Regions:
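Short coil/turn connectors at secondary-structure junctions
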Residues: 28-30, 77-78, 100-101, 129-132, ...
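Conserved beta-strand scaffold positions in the cores of enzyme catalytic domains, especially
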Residues: 55, 104, 165-167, 290-293
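A short acidic, often aromatic-flanked loop/helix-cap motif at beta-alpha or helix-coil junctions
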Residues: 110-115, 174-176, 208-210, 300-301
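Conserved core of the sugar-phosphate nucleotidyltransferase
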Residues: 146-268, 372, 397
Length: 419
């Protein structure tokens, strides 16, 4: 049974956090969990299975989205744990030399976010205790206002100490149909967390009219999938709501730091239920009154497609590509694969050649090139052109969400070499 403040030994159906817990009034540093998975198919052909978007520099800042996430979390974290696929563990280690190798958890196959986050939380609970506050943050989002982000996370940590499952709610900039929504209710009245509000429920991606109606109330925020919670609270909720999944995760976590890890992983991991943390924990616990949100405006971008990327890459102000946004190198300074994954004789990855990009009458266009070819845009304002050594994509921001369908069609046609 889930043991929550105000409901010791009680069930999720009666979970009402109300102010007990280990807090001494100080803000706890969280143990960050970064799930780094997925192929980022909406950013094909830049993002591929062997080189997914979280390993790429998609903002022109000289570091990958993953590196940016770790750097952003540093002021509020005690430890950082990254969960990624076995195919990417070496690249992740190369990009994050500051993260201890034992904090990089390799999952044998994708089992969705609950398995990844649950495993990390269970390993952290074994290493640091069940009262450790954990926070899960995607590896491939960007945040412009780091001060606002850190403030929201600190408030969330104080709420989590009191037994809440906390989600960071993004102040919506418009009635988007691309995101889920959080319905916020009354204040939580937790000292040190003045913005905390009870969550009345979660809604999947609505249609445009419904999204506009939500925003008109002032009580809805975008759901960015960021969760902060005590490790023990998360695992207790999981044990009650998904007991088989919880048992499998617990068995794997118990063996993680002992020689039997691989044997237990091989036996238990493939049988874990594939389910998102939203469905496994957030929605049912919110229905029982146990979820809070901290709303924040922080310039968040999920980098979910080329339409989102056009908002991140500023147009050049001078030179032959003036007026257009240009990404002429997407490999971060450390660790990302080269354009074709080839290595030199000394084992290093060669730098992709810089593109020669020229723009005429094409203001607002976005050009991403890793081929080294000369790319010229003439009279196509707002176009999106992605030129790689083996694939060329031309689209517009308005149609860019359809890229995933293109990838699905290529897979159906047997073009695995392009994915």
């Amino acid at each position: 049974m889930t043991d929550t403040p105000g409901n010791p030994g009680g069930s999720t159906q009666a979970a009402h956090p109300c102010g007990s817990g280990p807090s001494d009034g100080s803000v706890p540093a969280i143990h960050a969990i970064i799930p780094a998975g997925g192929a980022g198919t909406r950013l094909w052909p830049l993002s591929r299975r062997h080189r997914p978007k979280f390993l790429l520099d998609l903002t022109g800042a000289g570091h990958s989205l993953l590196q940016d996430t770790v750097e952003r979390l540093a002021p509020v974290t005690a430890t950082t744990t990254v969960v990624t696929g076995v195919a990417h563990i070496a690249a992740v280690a190369d990009q994050l030399p500051q993260v201890p190798r034992e904090n990089l958890l390799a999952e044998p196959s994708p089992r969705d976010s609950m398995a990844a986050i649950g495993l990390a939380a269970a390993v952290i609970a074994h290493r640091h205790g069940r009262d450790a506050v954990v926070g899960s943050f995607a590896a491939d989002h960007t945040v412009a206002d780091r001060t606002a982000f850190a403030g929201a996370v600190r408030q969330a940590a104080l709420l989590a100490e009191q037994g809440w499952v906390v989600t960071i709610g993004i102040e919506a900039t418009g009635p988007s149909t691309a995101f889920g929504y959080i319905h916020a209710g009354d204040p939580t009245d937790v000292p040190g967390a003045p913005d905390g509000r009870r969550v009345l429920g979660f809604t999947e991606k609505p249609d445009a009219d419904t999204a506009a109606a939500y925003l008109a109330t002032g009580d809805y925020r975008w759901n960015a999938g960021m969760f902060v919670v005590r490790a023990g609270v998360l695992l207790d909720h999981l044990a009650e709501l998904r007991p088989q999944l919880a048992a499998g995760i617990d068995a794997i976590a118990a063996a993680w730091d002992v020689p039997e890890r691989e044997e237990v992983l091989a036996e238990r991991w493939p049988a874990l239920e594939k389910i998102a943390i939203d469905h496994a924990i957030a929605e049912p616990v919110a229905a029982a009154g146990g979820v809070a949100t901290v709303p924040v405006s922080m310039g968040w971008n999920d980098v979910g497609g080329f339409d989102a990327l056009t908002e991140l890459v500023a147009p050049r102000s001078e030179g032959p590509a003036a007026g257009a946004g240009v990404l002429d190198s997407v490999d971060s300074a450390d660790g990302a694969d080269g354009a074709d994954g080839a290595e030199t004789v000394d084992g290093s990855v060669p730098e992709a050649p810089r593109a020669d990009v020229r723009v005429v009458g094409s203001d607002g266009a976005l050009i991403a090139s890793t081929s080294g070819r000369t790319v010229v845009l003439l009279g196509v304002p707002g176009a999106v052109v992605v030129d790689t050594p083996d694939a060329l994509l031309v689209t517009t921001p308005e149609h860019s969400q359809g890229v995933k369908g293109v990838v699905d069609a290529l897979r159906a046609a047997g073009r695995e070499d392009l994915l």
